[in-house]
Structures are given as structure tokens and as C-alpha cells.
């Protein structure tokens, strides 16, 4: 079946809008966190459990979604995800307590999110684009950030004007009445299906050799753990951090954060190609993230109180936010045999999500213990500093190997 050359760009636009809607499920949480905690008479560590469960669920489910795509229609999997997200939004307001809320948000919402976006949308767009594939995927990746940029003012105002329960109900209706039809009628099936099938045998020996002996994979996985740990705490606790510090224009800060995430994500891929080294770019990203955390640490320690420190954090953390995952994935795909890449990427995503889940809960727990975020920020600084250094090791190894080769 032949389609208009313009059709793929319309499909990308519809998928972009679809992804913004699905990402609203997790992006809106931090804006509703404090009102929800008050409604359930829960502290921050307890309400944060829902996000931890969500991140663990998505980490596990995304590992298997790629295999399901090869057996079932990707659009059916995305539709299942959209139904689960819509159902979660509609049921959550009727949760009798925080434990039921956490189970619904974390498990049902996590399954829905994993099926609706991520591996599925990337696969879907890859099937549509034979050319301009890199640009298309880069645009799609920024749907989450665009949603944060565009919708932050709504998320900030909604729980205090309409209430979080009514807001969730409205979102559930929008998912079912707008985004599901958009998927069915706008996001058409790709003109040609992927011919590849799941391998019947798996190279377990090669897999375990890589896991046990490859220093590169250990370094990349540590970096991904650091990325997930620092992103998790910021995704769930940034708005409470800013409000506790009485920062003015929190809504504007969050919108700017989304803009910096988009800019940083696009720049990271371009610069890594320009530098010719994923490792160097990863190190640079972690160094930028280290500077951002230092900006956050200064007002927390009481050294100097100014909104500019928080803006500096928003700027630098935003620029380093999305680059680590795609560059790590690129490094894995360029360094290991094809038959192992899917599993290695699945573990990569799982580590990222588990690290995020740990930090979300730890951030709430440390706050309840110390009434501040100093301890969790200090832990993040240690992880990021280590990652900024060790990500350079593969680059230095290559330079050393080149020098040895030339000397011979």
C-alpha cells in the first residue's frame, strides 16, 4: 500500500499529541502530590510509594513489550495502554485510602503507560519513517517535555480550582473520548510491517559474558542508575521543593524546565555526533547535572537565598535531563551484537526505573526524617560526580588503545 509522503508527518503529529496525553498521567502527579497527601492524611513518603510502584511496573513491563510487538499489532498494544490509563484516571478519585490509590496508580497506570508510549510509539514511528527517522524519533522523544511545557500552568491551577479528583475524572474522559479515536482514525497502520520475528533461541552465553566481563556495560548501567535516581527525585519532588522554598513563579519555572529539557535533548544527540564520542558527551551531561545540583544545594544549605539559584538548577538540570538515555542506548547498539541489544536495552530501562523508584521513596522518607531535602540532594551529588568521571573511562581506553596501536 502506497501512501502520500505527507502522511507520515501527519501520523507523527498525531502520535506526538497522543504521547503528550499519555505522559500527562505521570507529569501531573507532582502538581497534585500535596493535595492528594492531604486528602489521604498521608505523609510525602507514603504518597510517593505510588510513583515508586509505577516506575517499577513500567520498568518490568517495558522489558517485555518489545517481544509482544513482534506477535501482536503495535496499535492494539497502544490502545490497551490508553484504555488502562483512562481507567486509572477514572477510578483513582474513588480510592478509599492511599494504599489502594498507590496500587491503582502504580500497577494499572504503570501497565497502561508501558503499553501506550515508549517502546511502542518509537517502534510505530520507526515503521513509518524510512528517511528522516532520526529527526522523527527526536521529535517524538520531546513529546513528554512539550507536555510539561504546555500543560504545567493547567496542572498547577487545577487541583486548587477544580480539585484533583475532578481533574483526574476529566482527564480520564479526555483519554477515552479524544485520544483513543485519535489512535484509531489518525495514527494509521504503517504501510509496511516489520518483517523481523522473535528469535527462537537466545545466546545466553553471550549475554552472560557481556554482563560479567564487559566494563563498558557496567559503566553505562551505573550512569543509567544515576540518571534514574536523580530524575526520579526531581520528577516527583521538584514542585514541593520550590514551594517549600517559597519560590515565586513556580508555574513559569516548570514551563521553562520543559523548554530546557527539549533544547538539551536535541543538543545532546547533535553534539555527540559532532564530538564523535558518546562517552565524552555522557560525561559532559553528568558534569552539567552536577553543577545543577550544586545550584540547588546552595539555598538548601542557607549559604545564599535567591530564586536565581533555583532558576540555575532548572536551566542546567533541564539541559542534561533527556540526553543520558538515548546516548546510552546508542552506545549499547553500537558496541554489542544485534542478538543481545534488545535484552541489554531492556535491562537498561529497568535499572533506570528501579533507580527512580528508590529515589522517589527515599526523597519522601528523608524529608519526613529531616524536614528537608539536603540528604537526598547530597546523595545525588555523590552519584552524579562519580558518573561524570567514570563515563570518561571508555574514551580513555580507546585513546590508550590507539596510542598502543600506533607505537606498534
Swiss-Prot record:
Keywords per UniProt: Cell membrane, Membrane, Transmembrane, Transmembrane helix, Transport
Transmembrane feature ranges: 9-29, 49-69, 77-97, 100-120, 135-155, 167-187, 216-236, 252-272, 283-303, 308-328, 340-360, 373-393
Family matches, as Pfam families: MFS_1
Top-level taxonomic group: Bacteria
Species this chain originates from: Bacillus subtilis (strain 168)
Single annotated GO MF: transmembrane transporter activity
InterPro entries the record matches: MFS, MFS_dom, MFS_trans_sf, Proton-linked_MCT
Topology term for the membrane: Multi-pass membrane protein
Descriptive protein name: Uncharacterized MFS-type transporter YcxA
Subcellular location field: Cell membrane
PANTHER family named in the record: EG:103B4.3 PROTEIN-RELATED (PTHR11360:SF284), MONOCARBOXYLATE TRANSPORTER (PTHR11360)
Family that this chain belongs to: Belongs to the major facilitator superfamily.
UniProt main location, coarse: membrane
CDD domains the UniProt entry points to: MFS_MCT_like (cd17314)
UniProt GO cellular component terms: plasma membrane
